[in-house]
Amino acid sequence: MTAVSLSDGTAVLKTDPWLEPFSGALRERYAAYQKQRTIIEEHEGGLAEFSKGYKSMGFQIDKNGGVRYREWASNATEARLIGEFNNWSHTANPMTKSPFGVWECYVPPVSPGVCAIPHDSMVKISMTLPGGESIDRIPTWITRVTQDLNISPIYDGRFWNPPKEQQYQFKHGHSTRPVEGLKIYEAHVGISSPNMRVTTYKEFEVDVLPKIKQLGYNCIQMMAIMEHAYYASFGYQVTNFFAASSRFGTPEELKSLVDKAHELGLTVLLDVVHSHASKNILDGINMYDGSDHLYFHEGGRGRHDQWDSRLFNYGQHEVLRFLLSNLRFWMDIYMFDGFRFDGVTSMMYKHHGIGSGFSGGYHEYFGDSVDLEAMVYLMLANAMLHETYPHVVTIAEDVSGMPTLCRPVAEGGVGFDYRLSMAIPDMWIKLLKEYTDDQWEMGQIVHNLTNRRHLEKSVAYAESHDQALVGDKTLAFWLMDKEMYDFMSDLSPLTPIIDRGLALHKMIRFIVHTLGGEAYLNFEGNEFGHPEWMDFPREGNGNSFAHARRQFNLVDDKLLRYKYLYEFDVAMNWLEDKYKWLNSPQAYVSLKHEGDKMIVFERAGLLFIFNFHPTQSFTDYRVGVDTAGEYKVILTSDETRFGGHNRIDMGGRYFTTPMEWNGRKNWLQVYSPSRTVLVLGL
């Protein structure tokens, strides 16, 4: 047996003895992390200081109005700062190069306190390459870029330095306590209204934040904030890592949005994309200094075949400074509370998860296929964030099931707080596409919902933005399809398809919420069964906004049945807020009955009874429960206010009998209508 040590990366063996054969790989990984961290400690004054690169790189404005500009571009032989402020002169502001390839210049103030570079004016760096060629680029640490389609689709870098009276002053800081029972509302600002146009930060703040609060979510995950030239990339082809997308408004307006969310008690996470970058050259960071390998791996290793994008070289010192400082920047300047890391699977493996099924065998997670440099970056990122911000939240998007992903770095883990349970939405889509309701296997549903790593927290969700993208469709549309166009009004007949769709949409969300993890996520609009799919304006659809919006008006129209699904979401979230099952130990499942299509489990002192049978209701159905007493109805999806048939007496009382049943000490008998969930409590 390997001796467990807190200092060599094998402490994770305490929580998972199956890692024993891979203790050598764990030691190697932790040693690589310690080596990189030691280099940073010795040469940069520590991880905390190293990750403050945004305070030294890019544009730094001193108290007298002078501007110092620094840029890493080791391949360039000459460099100069050009812009509207110097009439794009290639001689006015030359830069000098350090031995480490960092260029620098100082622009003195026009007069004391008066900056020579006007606020929001255009700037670029112009560089000469070894062959004599001259290239212009947008500064990599730029905080604002804009696009004027009347001139060009290429973005322009802008010097953002508003007068003090125009600078947003935060009234609220980061959360002072850990978030319990994380209920995440995944949102994209640009699609957040029924209008066929891009929604703004201000509109989101005024119109959407109150909805999120009222729905009972306590966290927002904001997509597509990092600037991306191609809107239809959903924000995943980032061009400018320190710039908040100008499509939606100004940096100050985003700060106001985050501050308002904090005022409402909401945690705000940024969907951060450090797994790859846009291959754009003129308005991105690709080929930045004329070389193929400044921020990225050279050649094929630096390119993602499926995403058509560039891949970072996580072993490069300046790349680590850039990415770690990027995290600090969003935390410090915009007051985000944490991150959902995109594409972690692609980062962790040299094959990027392409063509790998991941059987769950531990040999797949260690060895030559793992990108050790990327793993070290993720460990450094999580260590820096958790050491600097006590209540930060980090979530990994990983489909592989990497062990130790959500264990602390000090134990030898990768350091994330949560992982996304990506197999859960896949299961529902497969069931709805390939099986009739009477073919659903209760055991398989329970297995998929509870199959998660011991002591590694997961975010459960029935569907996210991924499921809604063009080529797929929302859960509601899988259930009800074209009948949603004609039969979602209370004035129209309740067809069998709509009746089934409403019932199952509620049950699917609720069983995921209660059984699936330690946190819950919903993509905006799906709380009320948003129809159709997501498709951003692009050439292939005539640049249409028809599917790049969220039709909140469907809920506001009280004649439509969407209100029932919405109200159930409200009830579900606020019930969790009261009983806190997401913070409770994993549920005890006492029944998975294939013939009856019944699932029964206990969690957080509540008894959950799901009847997935398409037609069969059960009278005096016996279910086991551990705690004796008189149980009452806490919630049922069959209530009229949720579009149900009101078949359950809300004032009913259920008394336990002290006799063992399904492995529990007591039993009680209930009426369980078909396609209904019943929640009982003492």
Swiss-Prot record:
Sites where the protein binds (1,4-alpha-D-glucosyl)n: 88, 124
Catalytic activity: Transfers a segment of a (1->4)-alpha-D-glucan chain to a primary hydroxy group in a similar glucan chain
Enzyme Commission number, as recorded: 2.4.1.18
Gene3D superfamilies: Glycosidases, Golgi alpha-mannosidase II, Immunoglobulins
GO cellular-component term (any): cytoplasm
Keyword Transferase: yes
GO molecular function (one): hydrolase activity, hydrolyzing O-glycosyl compounds
Sites annotated Transition state stabilizer: 466
Keyword Transferase: yes
Biological or metabolic pathway of the protein: Glycan biosynthesis; glycogen biosynthesis
Biological-process GO terms, alphabetical: glycogen biosynthetic process
Main location: cytoplasm
InterPro entries associated with the record: A-amylase/branching_C, Branching_enzy, Glyco_hydro_13_cat_dom, Glyco_hydro_13_N, Glyco_hydro_b, Glycoside_hydrolase_SF, Ig-like_fold, Ig_E-set
Catalytic residue list: 342 (nucleophile), 397 (proton donor)
Keywords assigned: Cytoplasm, Glycogen biosynthesis, Glycosyltransferase, Transferase
Described function: Glycogen-branching enzyme participates in the glycogen biosynthetic process along with glycogenin and glycogen synthase. Generates alpha-1,6-glucosidic branches from alpha-1,4-linked glucose chains, to increase solubility of the glycogen polymer.
UniProt family annotation: Belongs to the glycosyl hydrolase 13 family. GlgB subfamily.
Protein name, entry field: 1,4-alpha-glucan-branching enzyme
